[in-house]
Structures are given as C-alpha cells and as structure tokens.
Amino acid sequence: MGPGLRPLLPLVLCVGLSALVPSAGASGFRKRGPSVTAKVFFDVRIGDKDVGRIVIGLFGKVVPKTVENFVALATGEKGYGYKGSKFHRVIKDFMIQGGDFTRGDGTGGISIYGETFPDENFKLKHYGIGWVSMANAGPDTNGSQFFITLTKPTWLDGKHVVFGKVLDGMTVVHSIELQATDGHDRPFTDCSIVNSGKIDVKTPFVVEVSDW
C-alpha cells in the first residue's frame, strides 16, 4: 500500500480550511493551518544506531477518527501497534512510509476499527515537506500504514487522508530518506521504530502552512 506508485506496490477543508487566515512569516507567505490536538513520538533506530525521535502533531478536530487510530497504534493500547515496526518504503525527495506492523513489507497492517476504515475526509492537503498522510490501496482502504512527505505531492490530494505534521525530528526523517534501497524501495538497513507513544497537548495550537 502506498501513495503514488500503486502499480508497483499495491498498498501504499470545509471546517479546517475556514480557519486558514494570512499571517506574516520571514520565510515567505504563510497561512494559519489546522490545530494540533495531540502528539505522538517515534524513537528511531537505523541498523544498530539510535538516531533520534520524530514528534508528530495530529489534527483531531479535522480528522478525529483517523487521529484516534494513529494515537492508539502509537501507544499500543489495543495490544498491537507501531512499536517494533519498520519504515519499509523509502523514496528520496518523495516520502518515507511505515506502519505495516503485521507483515513489514507494505502488504499488511490493520486499524483499530478492523482491517480497514473509510476515508474520513480530504479537508487537509499535502502542503509540503513533513506532512503525514494515510497510505492506502485505493478509496476507503485505510489501515495502519502512513507516510511522511519529502516534497509537496499535490497529486495525492483528495486520494490520501492528511492527518498530521512533523513538529520535531525532521533530521531523523531525512536520515531515513538517505538510506540506500533495493528495487522495491525497501531500505537495505532496517529503519525501526523502537519505541512509540503519546505526548499530551494541554492547549491545542495552530501550525502554519507555507507558500501554498
């Protein structure tokens, strides 16, 4: 399951956008984006080296069901989840993909609602680098797999549900991106989530969307 190259690998805002208002930014035109209501973390190991933590902000007001699924899989509260799984698909300047904790090759994974669940909405877009979206095998086939963008893949808008953004740890994401891969985009060196969990957000806060 995955975004984009589906023939090669089978699995890859009304309310929210109304809140987008212009604001000034030193690095270009910016708009206020969705509110972060929860955060999760992934502690990542590449080979036998711990490379750091990825912290992802989640937009529970826009896509509450998708966020609930992601948080539960990060904490492992249902008895299964992301801890111990790998980033199994890496395409430089496009995305890194993970979340297949049942098979580890992009053909597995399950949600907390059953094997799959429907697309919640497409109110959020793939605005640029560091946005987090659900991988799928077509409409309404969301499970546990997700990807983190390394570009602005607008061709995925309306096809994959965006639900989060990397808040900290893009250096870790880029370390995964730089791994050598085989002909199926699988890293030769394991890129593993050795620990994962939830970080409480006492007061929701807004992320900015740049240059779109």
UniProtKB/Swiss-Prot annotation:
Q: What is its EC number?
A: 5.2.1.8
| Residue ranges constituting the PPIase cyclophilin-type domain according to the UniProt record | 41-198
Listed under GO biological process in this entry are: protein folding
The chemistry this enzyme catalyses reads: [protein]-peptidylproline (omega=180) = [protein]-peptidylproline (omega=0)
Question: Which controlled-vocabulary keywords does the entry list?
Answer: Cytoplasm, Isomerase, Rotamase
Look at the named UniProt entry and state the broad enzyme category this protein falls under. isomerase
How, per the record, is this protein's activity regulated?
Inhibited by cyclosporin A (CsA).
GO terms for cellular component? cytoplasm; intracellular membrane-bounded organelle
Per UniProt, subcellular location reads as: Cytoplasm
Top-rank taxon of the source lineage equals: Eukaryota
Give one Pfam family: Pro_isomerase
Q: Tell me which SUPFAM superfamilies the record gives.
A: Cyclophilin-like (SSF50891)
Q: Which InterPro entries match?
A: Cyclophilin-like_dom_sf, Cyclophilin-type_PPIase_CS, Cyclophilin-type_PPIase_dom
Alphabetically, the GO molecular function entries are: cyclosporin A binding; peptidyl-prolyl cis-trans isomerase activity
Family to which this protein belongs: Belongs to the cyclophilin-type PPIase family.
Q: What does this protein do?
A: PPIase that catalyzes the cis-trans isomerization of proline imidic peptide bonds in oligopeptides and may therefore assist protein folding.
Put simply, this protein is called Peptidyl-prolyl cis-trans isomerase C
Q: What is the lineage of its organism?
A: Eukaryota, Metazoa, Chordata, Craniata, Vertebrata
